Amino acid sequence: MPKYYCDYCDTFLTHDSPSVRKTHNNGRKHKENVRFYYQKWMEEQAQTLIDQTTAAFQSKPNSQMPPNAPPGLMPPPGMLPPPGGMPPGRMPPQGLPFPPPGPIPPPPGAGGMRPPHGQMHMGGPRPQMGRPPMSLRS
């Protein structure tokens, strides 16, 4: 009669009956071995992913800078300056001025009246701009 082999525990069970397998699979040692097996497998998968990512970055040049760019060239438009502002001696690229200080202006076509300063709309759907409420219509 063939014996049941547990790959996780690296052992043969005494019998190949469902009750023996069930008892073995519910045991503390078997559960620890299964947990250890999958933990090790996940670590190997993570390391493989790290190795693939590292190899991909080492095989490609810096993709944010154009090829054969001279050192010190600004990144392409849309790239934000580093935290803390621009490094000394560098100017922002032409065509991308810094916004003026103060509140952010409304987007083009927003139109309508804004609430007085300090009175923001709280909760609920925003009323439509440009039309009086239903209660004020005649």
Curated annotation (Swiss-Prot):
It is found in: Nucleus. This is U1 small nuclear ribonucleoprotein C. Residues 113-138 have a biased composition (Low complexity). It comes from Nematostella vectensis. The keyword Zinc applies. Component of the spliceosomal U1 snRNP, which is essential for recognition of the pre-mRNA 5' splice-site and the subsequent assembly of the spliceosome. U1-C is directly involved in initial 5' splice-site recognition for both constitutive and regulated alternative splicing. The interaction with the 5' splice-site seems to precede base-pairing between the pre-mRNA and the U1 snRNA. Stimulates commitment or early (E) complex formation by stabilizing the base pairing of the 5' end of the U1 snRNA and the 5' splice-site region. Keywords: Metal-binding, Nucleus, Ribonucleoprotein, RNA-binding, Zinc, Zinc-finger. It holds the Pfam family zf-U1. Residues 67-109 have a biased composition (Pro residues). One of its GO terms (molecular function) is mRNA binding. GO terms for biological process: mRNA 5'-splice site recognition; spliceosomal snRNP assembly. InterPro entries: Matrin/U1-C_Znf_C2H2, Matrin/U1-like-C_Znf_C2H2, U1-CZ_Znf_C2H2, U1_snRNP-C, Znf_C2H2_sf. U1 snRNP is composed of the 7 core Sm proteins B/B', D1, D2, D3, E, F and G that assemble in a heptameric protein ring on the Sm site of the small nuclear RNA to form the core snRNP, and at least 3 U1 snRNP-specific proteins U1-70K, U1-A and U1-C. U1-C interacts with U1 snRNA and the 5' splice-site region of the pre-mRNA. The keyword Zinc applies. One of its GO terms (cellular component) is U2-type prespliceosome. Belongs to the U1 small nuclear ribonucleoprotein C family. Residues 58-138 are annotated as: Disordered. A zinc finger (Matrin-type) spans 4-36. Its main location: nucleus.
